[in-house]
């Protein structure tokens, strides 16, 4: 986290949010997945989230880098399936909860298990993977109010197989619009994720047409050197779609 802050300062960013992943492999009362008879182990390796260590390191970074606004955060995976577990964990972050809460989808139910998106490309045609993904993403948006920002809208696009030909957003316009309509209706925000292939200005136009009023920028870094990566290009795309800087340099970009 210290190195990420160093990179943020070097990149000229006014602030950074550390949105660590929050994924679950067990469930409790109130978690929908408990009634679905699904194997939830969608990744070969998952590590415990050290909330105490995270918060202590966050405080240390704030002391070291007073010129940065350093926000707490979390990225909840499949929040619609683990509503109770996710809510209980978020509450441990202290009064008011994390500054930023992202919602994301990395895996979908398939043949009795929660299956990671990249595995699905080995089991069905690429277009079917995307349609299955968007259908589950819509269930996430409609089925969870825990998050503020929807992360990496078309996550499996990162793994789109070359053999399937170029990825065309227009081929999935109906699916994109369904998700964007639901997200806008809930008055939440869309992330422009610079680790994924950048959303086009046209797709961000669909977000505007759905009633979306704001976007956030996320480098989805995972490594310090990626903090702020491609933000200048992302700004160009977002501006082309009509969004502008918000009330101050820390705000979301808005219409």
Placement of each model-derived feature along the sequence:
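Hydrophobic faces of well-ordered beta-strands that scaffold small-molecule active sites
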Residues: 16-18, 70-74, 101-103, 149-151, ...
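Short, acidic/polar
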Residues: 1-7, 81-91, 132-141
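Charged catalytic cores and adjacent phosphate/nucleic-acid-binding surfaces used
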Residues: 1-6, 163-255
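Acidic (Asp/Glu)-rich catalytic clusters
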Residues: 10, 56-66, 87-102, 141-145, ...
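Residues that form or immediately flank small-molecule/cofactor binding pockets and catalytic motifs
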Residues: 75, 155, 250-252
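Short aromatic-enriched loop/helix-cap "lid" or pocket-rim segments at secondary-structure transitions
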Residues: 29-30, 85, 114-115
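An N-terminally biased module of ancient metal coordination in phosphate/nucleic-acid-related enzymes
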Residues: 1-80, 158-170, 178, 222-229, ...
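Divalent metal-binding pocket/active-site signature
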Residues: 22-25, 81, 96-181, 190, ...
